[in-house]
Amino acid sequence: MGPGDLVLEIGPGRGALTHMLARRVDVLVGVEVDPELAARLRRELADLPHVHIVHADILSCDIGQIVLERARGAQGLRRFMVVANLPYCITTPVLHKLLSASPLFEAFTLMIQLEVAQKLTATAGSVGYGELSLMAQYYTRPEILFTVGPTSFAPPPSVQSAVVRMTVSKSPCAGDLDPGELFAIVRAGFAKRRKNIRNSLVSSALFGGDHDLVAAVLGSAGIDGRLRAEQLGLDEFARLARAAVALGAVHAVDRKSGGESGDVD
């Protein structure tokens, strides 16, 4: 990260990373939910006009609006990036929100729980593979850069952490599909992990017990209904989604390009 970059830092806290980033990038936007910490950072960085500390909850604010408003007037910006040391308790919802807003960004660099990092990079048939893996790999190319032990923190957590880089894919491999259509099928497939894909789809709200429709979708997609969802890769789920759309089982739903609106100070 350097000149020409806008960086969104989620949860800057006491500002250890914030102060370092402020010296390197052209625009820095920190979103902090704690009002006292946000006010403290504003005071400490008041002489740096390119640094913007926003008091808001990242889960309820509009990420795109926050970033684009702070980018206005800046010259020569080439890339928008995200940096965060995410609290374990909100890692998954923040990831979902970032992935939905991914077209705005070049990459995310995140410190997260190692178990979650392994889910992001998991492949079909491996431990931890699921909906989050598919979302991450549809929108980005995730990779684990390095692990961080508990002794690096005070107080030390009971789990390992990892730093991951998620480079945004500008041309998703299933780009012909609306993401809502694709992930409606993914969610239906993983709703009953212990069942095979046929039974999981049949029992989902999406298909409402329609055995014939599920059989038609599986047949059209060329998917063996005896397989489980965790055995199917992104390409197989994309084939299922295309078949479901063609047969009228799935419509354009759950379209998301950013976040929901929320209070920002």
Question: Can you name each region flagged by the protein language model?
Answer:
Residues 1-188, 219, 230, 239, ...:
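Catalytic cores of RNA-modifying enzymes
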Residues 207-245:
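RNA substrate-recognition surfaces in RNA-acting enzymes
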